[in-house]
């Protein structure tokens, strides 16, 4: 056991986590050179296309150190994006140490900080690594100083390497073996294994990634899930070298995978503890704190025949992504679907793309909203995650919106622009600290403004240099109203949105104008209106298509023309009464882009 090292790699987006993982795998001979490819651990197509890590992946490697001993390295590559911070905290729970990778050109960023603090809170040994020293813009001494000033860990002898060229990666491994402690645990004690992650395989059922804290697990053992009390047979187990390799036993302190032929997706929940049926442990391991979704949106299949397939797909995805929440929902405009909860907009996009790609579904998404706290006139407090669930205006005593605490790190020259942006988003500044050329800003901004497009706008006002980390702080009373959209004087529930009264008129007008461009012209006039309660705040009309009925008249009497026009008018009127308007998918996406341009 003393030769096992469990560690994660944490870093801000694009600081080179996945490339460093590649080099480590190559150095330890986990894959032959022929099988090696760039970003070996980003196995999803989506991850490769966007160049981001979404799922944490684990690998077991053997490393022969300079002291002649062979060490077993279990390491987990984690995502850097704020929306996937839950993946990071789960990975860290399985480790004794973490490599903090910092880009020697860009320096410390907000996400580096957030993930690093998570690691320190969990009592992990943090080893700083300065990556990308081969870049002309690299300034390792300045960055080492920054790590000490901002993060507060000693970085004077931080390892310097370049994951791309492979320089200094050997030193990283030596430092790892030296500084990160070996796992603690009792090989003879009853088995306690933590489920870090699980996913669904069509042939094997549920595959779980586990970390053995105490005891040992052998092939063929009967294991028991501690929260549900169900027992399963350990059919196959092994490790990833990134390839799946079968083993007969997983020892204390190791990280590996386990297949128990569990067909039910909720059979082995993530964060649960496995133990042996014949000799169970007394207590479960502390799991992970459940994350609360911050953004909700309705997802509906385009054709209602796909509903069952959609439900199964969501079940399988939520097994793999424990932070996804979903419940059934019906909408008059869109039929049956699900109300899903996400950690942020990127998370929502990724889930939607994964559903469309991996499960071949066509989906319509409604506008994302956050959770509001409503105190009704009966003094009940309810939580509303969808505009259609909001009670009528006269039943609401107080509406409170969620406030997010945003920590931003940015170079000084962009300070003015970023502060202007925060004020525009109704933000309140709570703190500002200068570290050398960097400024650390703390603002309290309504969550609805943050999840809509704050991140994109922040990046564009600061030319990509500012970084953001945010978390829910509290609910605060605010003057929010629901804006309804009426097409042909029928309310379309899927298009309603909740917004601040000050922005309601502008948002309503923008939305109505946008819808006007997207709804195809019909044989009759279509009125599109935005309303707060019964008060109409904006309107536009999609003009009808009409045939030129006078084309066949040459000169002649005006009453003849009037008769033809009158006849056409009556026809149009009749059409308008029975006609209904098909709304295209783009119309629902229009809400997402209101206020972007």
From Swiss-Prot:
Pfam families: EFG_C (PF00679), GTP_EFTU (PF00009), GTP_EFTU_D2 (PF03144), LepA_C (PF06421). Signal peptide: none annotated. Keywords: Cell inner membrane, Cell membrane, GTP-binding, Hydrolase, Membrane, Nucleotide-binding, Protein biosynthesis. GO terms for molecular function: GTP binding; GTPase activity; guanosine tetraphosphate binding; ribosome binding; translation elongation factor activity. Its EC number is 3.6.5.n1. It is found in: Cell inner membrane. Its main location: membrane. Gene3D superfamilies: 3.30.70.240, Elongation factor 4, C-terminal domain, Elongation Factor G (Translational Gtpase), domain 3, P-loop containing nucleotide triphosphate hydrolases, Translation factors. GTP binds at residues 14-19, 131-134. This is Elongation factor 4. It comes from Edwardsiella ictaluri (strain 93-146). The gene is lepA.
């Amino acid at each position: 056991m003393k030769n096992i090292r469990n560690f994660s790699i944490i870093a801000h987006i694009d600081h080179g986590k996945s490339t460093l993982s590649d080099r480590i795998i190559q150095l330890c001979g986990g894959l032959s050179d022929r099988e090696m490819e760039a970003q070996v651990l980003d196995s999803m197509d989506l991850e490769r296309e966007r160049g981001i890590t979404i799922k944490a992946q684990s690998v077991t490697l053997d490393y022969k150190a300079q002291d002649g001993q062979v060490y077993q390295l279990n390491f987990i590559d984690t995502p850097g994006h704020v929306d996937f911070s839950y993946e990071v905290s789960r990975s860290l729970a399985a480790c004794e140490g973490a490599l903090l990778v910092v880009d020697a050109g860009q320096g410390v960023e907000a996400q580096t900080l957030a993930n690093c603090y998570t690691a320190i809170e969990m009592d992990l040994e943090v080893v700083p690594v300065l990556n990308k020293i081969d870049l002309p813009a690299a300034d390792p001494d300045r960055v080492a100083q920054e790590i000490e000033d901002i993060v507060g860990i000693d970085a004077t002898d931080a390892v310097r390497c370049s994951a791309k060229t492979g320089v200094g990666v050997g030193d990283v491994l030596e430092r790892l073996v030296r500084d990160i402690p070996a796992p603690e645990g009792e090989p003879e004690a009853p088995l306690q294994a933590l489920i870090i992650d699980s996913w669904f395989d069509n042939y094997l059922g549920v595959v779980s990634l586990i970390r053995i804290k105490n005891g040992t697990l052998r092939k063929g053992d009967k294991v028991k899930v501690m929260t549900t009390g169900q027992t399963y047979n350990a059919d196959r187990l092994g490790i990833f070298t990134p390839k799946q390799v079968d083993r007969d036993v997983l020892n204390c302190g190791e990280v590996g995978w386990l297949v128990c032929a569990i067909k039910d997706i909720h059979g082995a929940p993530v964060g649960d503890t496995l133990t042996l049926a014949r000799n169970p442990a007394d207590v479960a391991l502390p799991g992970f704190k459940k994350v609360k979704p911050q953004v909700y949106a309705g997802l509906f299949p385009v054709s209602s025949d796909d509903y069952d397939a959609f439900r199964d797909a969501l079940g399988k995805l939520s097994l793999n992504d424990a932070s996804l929440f979903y419940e059934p929902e019906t909408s008059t405009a869109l039929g049956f679907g699900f109300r899903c909860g996400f950690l942020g907009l990127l998370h929502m996009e990724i889930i939607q793309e994964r559903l469309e790609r991996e499960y071949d579904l066509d989906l319509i998404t409604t506008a994302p909203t956050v959770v509001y706290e409503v105190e009704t006139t009966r003094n009940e407090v309810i939580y509303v995650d969808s505009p259609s669930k909001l009670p009528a205006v006269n039943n609401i005593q107080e509406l409170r919106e969620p406030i997010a605490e945003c920590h931003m790190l940015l170079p000084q020259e962009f300070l003015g622009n970023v502060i202007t942006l925060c004020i525009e988003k109704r933000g309140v500044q709570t703190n500002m600290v200068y570290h050398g050329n960097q400024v650390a800003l703390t603002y309290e901004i309504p969550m609805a403004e943050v999840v809509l497009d704050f991140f994109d706008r922040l990046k564009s006002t600061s030319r990509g240099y500012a970084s953001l980390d945010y978390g829910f702080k509290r609910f605060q009373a605010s003057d929010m109203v629901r804006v309804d959209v009426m097409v042909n004087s029928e309310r379309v529930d899927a298009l309603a949105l909740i917004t601040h009264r000050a922005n309601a008129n502008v948002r309503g007008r923008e939305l109505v104008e946008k819808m006007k461009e997207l709804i195809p012209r019909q044989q009759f006039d279509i009125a599109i209106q935005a309303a707060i309660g019964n008060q109409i705040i904006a309107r536009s009309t999609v003009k009808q298509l009409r045939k030129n009925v006078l084309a066949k008249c040459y000169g002649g009497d005006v009453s003849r023309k009037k008769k033809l026009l009158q006849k056409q008018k009556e026809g149009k009127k009749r059409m308008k009464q029975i006609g209904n308007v098909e709304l295209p998918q783009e119309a629902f996406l229009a809400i997402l882009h209101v206020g972007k341009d």
